[in-house]
């Protein structure tokens, strides 16, 4: 290990790979910003250690915060009581689907990442759950609500929010953009600086965030720090494959997206070596597996093909399709 190679140097490498010549003069300041926002020492030595943070014995329960209700008690408290009573010997981790204020898409159109939806409870309830179970939270990183403070400030041309969202010209050639939804990609919006067309991969209530703007990166580093401090151990990166946009490309799985995942892994691992990143990338198998990187991106990824193949095997009594698929999978990695 090179004792002269520090966390700061690694972050600089990530940022150069993400932004290229876009912010050459400000790259040092940005590196200092993200390291400081995460509460890390820039002179900390880099340790290239890959170890298993989970295995086949890990059982994760996935639930909404209000799946279990009890009169006059906040749902997160009820959920904790319910899990303690019935599942404490069965599960090791709890994935609470978006527990933030939201406007649509069952929580995935976030109004404010820094708050717990008051109808569910508060951060003390989240911390109480994290004290007894490994807690997974969704980092809805590609987009946020069109009614969020950020987007309201974007419309007003104020901070924080100015320049936070992807825009495009309707005359641009967007024919190659990969779309998971059928709604028009661009939404016309009147702003303080004139008419703009904002990019909406999923719905017009979910406006895509502009990671070309380093302020957006800083905002999410701040959010991640808050989640870690509140006990979150597992981070589900929602719709991360769509994160970076580049005209003339499919705008999915771009190199900058992979590099942002690498940067987040570096920062998260140094803040909490036991933290885990899982990418929600519902894409073809080869592209999905690429989010492992070289043991430097996601620790784990969703295997969307497996559940329907298992059902097919059980219903048909024929395991040939499952076996063929398993033969195409690479050996399991550390992580």
Segments and roles (model prediction):
Residues 64, 326-335:
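Active-site-proximal substrate-binding groove within the catalytic cores of carbohydrate-active enzymes
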Residues 2-221, 229, 242-313:
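Acidic/aromatic-lined carbohydrate-recognition and catalytic surfaces
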Residues 213-235, 322-330:
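An active-site-proximal structural segment forming one wall of the substrate-binding cleft
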Residues 309-319, 323-325:
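Extended, charge-rich low-complexity interaction segments
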Residues 94, 235-237:
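Hydrophobic residues within beta-strands of alpha/beta enzymes
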Residues 134, 319, 331-334:
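Generic structural signal for secondary-structure transition and capping sites
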């Amino acid at each position: 290990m090179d004792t002269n190679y520090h966390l700061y140097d690694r972050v600089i490498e990530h940022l150069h790979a993400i932004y290229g010549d876009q912010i050459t003069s400000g790259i040092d300041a940005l590196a200092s910003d993200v390291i400081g926002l995460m509460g890390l020492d820039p002179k900390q030595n880099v340790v290239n250690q890959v170890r298993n943070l989970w295995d086949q014995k890990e059982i994760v329960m996935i639930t909404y915060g209000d799946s279990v209700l009890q009169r006059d008690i906040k749902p997160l408290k009820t959920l904790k009581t319910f899990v303690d009573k019935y599942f404490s010997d069965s599960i090791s981790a709890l994935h609470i689907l978006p527990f933030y204020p939201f406007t649509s898409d069952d929580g995935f159109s976030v109004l404010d990442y820094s708050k717990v939806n008051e109808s569910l409870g508060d951060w003390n309830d989240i911390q109480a759950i994290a004290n007894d179970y490994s807690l997974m939270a969704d980092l809805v990183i590609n987009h946020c609500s069109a009614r969020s403070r950020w987007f309201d400030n974007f419309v007003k041309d104020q901070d924080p929010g100015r320049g936070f969202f992807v825009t495009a010209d309707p005359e641009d050639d967007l024919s190659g953009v990969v779309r998971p939804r059928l709604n028009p990609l661009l939404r016309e919006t009147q702003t303080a600086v004139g008419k703009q067309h904002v990019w909406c991969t999923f719905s017009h209530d979910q406006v895509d965030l502009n990671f070309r703007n380093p302020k957006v990166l800083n905002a999410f580093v701040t959010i991640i720090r808050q989640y870690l401090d509140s006990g979150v151990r597992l981070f589900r990166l929602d719709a991360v494959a769509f994160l970076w946009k580049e005209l003339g490309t499919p705008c999915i799985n771009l190199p900058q997206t992979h590099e942002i995942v690498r940067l987040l892994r570096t920062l998260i691992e140094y803040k909490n070596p036991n933290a885990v990143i899982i990418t929600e990338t519902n894409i073809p198998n080869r592209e999905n597996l690429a989010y492992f990187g070289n043991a430097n991106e996601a620790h784990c990824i969703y295997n969307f093909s497996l559940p329907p193949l298992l059902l097919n095997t059980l219903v048909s009594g024929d395991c040939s399709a499952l076996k063929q698929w398993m033969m195409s999978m690479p050996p399991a990695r550390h992580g």
